[in-house]
């Protein structure tokens, strides 16, 4: 590891931890956006000028009219009025605005660290991964929304991929922040067997997160609204009679 000064290590490490906090809240905001059915309320992707919301009734009506053209409005929300539209618009707008804020929270300190020559070639590559990865998450978010404009909802698989991309970026930031703050000093040591088990648990966790996103997106949990058993059974008797 490059011999960074303690000041540099802490500055970059805590900056990365801030990124983790921002991603955490972005995932929460994204979850609220999905639960309120707000994700398709903004039918355009304008990374720069889209930061400015409608400012008068004419602009609001124009934005609402664009929403009226998609399938979701025609089949699910045809009785929605402008006031109700503003409520779902808020969450999707807030979700996108937070993403822009995250971008500035990364780029401005990143540029400062480069100016101060605090970043060597190795760390530059690792931080570059964050920049590209974050861009991919944002771009995929729009691809996901655009795909959903032709249906009633955003496809659940798309939602799960979007979530996993964000959580993977979160995990990468945690690892890199720990690397900067502690260097080669491990927080604790584990036997190789436990390390392998730990990796297996992480893989299973990610699979469960993917499945959870799909179940949530399809509202499949409503089929068995009991816990911990499914209508009193560990393996529901209807399992063999059901098909996708």
Language-model region placement:
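Hydrophobic cores of alpha-helical transmembrane segments in multi-pass inner/ER membrane proteins
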Residues: 58, 102-108, 164-180
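Membrane-interfacial catalytic/cofactor-binding modules of polytopic membrane enzymes
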Residues: 210-244
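Interfacial segments of alpha-helical transmembrane regions
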Residues: 11-22, 122-131, 187-210
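N-terminal signal-anchor transmembrane alpha helix
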Residues: 14-51, 203-216
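Membrane-interface helix-loop-helix junctions at boundaries between adjacent transmembrane segments
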Residues: 119-133, 144-164, 185, 189, ...
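Individual transmembrane alpha-helix segments
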Residues: 66-104
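Interfacial helix-loop-helix junctions of multi-pass membrane proteins
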Residues: 32-44, 139-159, 163, 215-229
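Structural signal for the C-terminal ends of transmembrane alpha-helices
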Residues: 110-118, 175-185
